[in-house]
């Protein structure tokens, strides 16, 4: 029987959870750390605020948000992979953070009331959900008026030559890294498929606006291999 996208993605992340952080650094040449640092600077997260990290995975961005809002703030991380959350829980505990709560849940149906969060983020997770627009609308719903929602995700390079090199790397080299370092060729083959099929920067910006966000900002990184989309809720 053919697996749904949701079932396949769940299996992928349950299987790669132990190697996910290491492989992220290898695949992106550690650029993802600089990308997220720049996004956090642009968000200008304030102390005492409330944040939600959707598709939080092993909780790296969740932890960054928790440190930014401080002990008087509160951060929730949500993911549908229990194994990824277990890794995240260990990292949260190791840092002694008491303002973080990790939740097993579905990004398509966020278990929070309307207008709950000052900041809502999703990092390298939107491409893996069954329906991009449903998740963007859910993120908009739970963002407070005046709040910020941010997506940091792989994107489609537009520079000729580099674009072809990027696709070659994602299609052939990245799964090979997965096989050599994480014994997970099939799983990392899925990651390149999802990245290749994900909307480009302009299309995703339009989806942000269609979901209800205003003053949408787009920032490409490293010749466009990744991009930040930031929107505000009226």
Swiss-Prot record:
Chain segments annotated as coiled-coil in the UniProt record: none
CDD domains tied to this protein: AdoMet_MTases (cd02440)
UniProt keyword annotation of S-adenosyl-L-methionine present: yes
Keyword terms: Menaquinone biosynthesis, Methyltransferase, S-adenosyl-L-methionine, Transferase
GO terms assigned for molecular function: demethylmenaquinone methyltransferase activity
Gene3D superfamilies in the record: Vaccinia Virus protein VP39
SUPFAM superfamilies per UniProt: S-adenosyl-L-methionine-dependent methyltransferases
InterPro entries per the UniProt record, alphabetical: MenG_heptapren, SAM-dependent_MTases_sf, UbiE/COQ5_MeTrFase, UbiE/COQ5_MeTrFase_CS
Signal peptide positions (record): none
Annotated S-adenosyl-L-methionine binding sites: 58, 79, 106-107
Keyword Coiled coil: no
Catalysed reaction equations from the record: a 2-demethylmenaquinol + S-adenosyl-L-methionine = a menaquinol + S-adenosyl-L-homocysteine + H(+)
Pathway: Quinol/quinone metabolism; menaquinone biosynthesis; menaquinol from 1,4-dihydroxy-2-naphthoate: step 2/2
Protein EC: 2.1.1.163
A GO biological process held by the record: menaquinone biosynthetic process
Role played: Methyltransferase required for the conversion of demethylmenaquinol (DMKH2) to menaquinol (MKH2).
NCBIfam families noted in UniProt: MenG_heptapren, MenG_MenH_UbiE, PRK00216.1-4, PRK00216.1-5
Family designation: Belongs to the class I-like SAM-binding methyltransferase superfamily. MenG/UbiE family.
HAMAP family given in the database record: MenG_UbiE_methyltr (MF_01813)
PANTHER family reported for this sequence: 2-METHOXY-6-POLYPRENYL-1,4-BENZOQUINOL METHYLASE, MITOCHONDRIAL, METHYLTRANSFERASE
Protein name: Demethylmenaquinone methyltransferase
Source organism per UniProt: Geobacillus stearothermophilus
Upper taxonomic lineage: Bacteria, Bacillati, Bacillota, Bacilli, Bacillales
